[in-house]
């Protein structure tokens, strides 16, 4: 019950911003098998304050759907939350499929309590895993600034 209330509260936070349509988009979700979405919701709320437009897919999203959403929305990046179970045998397949199908120019961020469990895999795939939310926000700020500079 407390989780449902917290989810509603965090979900409402991310819709308080007024969007202009010029914000860069970020797809936020949890991969197949990952049902705990509070971390993903927190990221959605935080990045909206930082000028990103979160495209929130909810939990348990297959790699193919993440790729399709990123391509259709024109997302500049993808953020995944990995929490429980840390040793989910589907994670390596889903992350590998996501990285292979998504444009290599689109960075993929991975965070959450189970991200460290998959460090070797995420490193090999070139996924980014900032250890804190502040570092994620900083990385997204740098990404946004580099893309603004590239389009000028």
Positions of predicted regions on the chain:
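C-terminal regulatory/effector modules of DNA-binding transcriptional regulators
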Residues: 1-2, 8-152
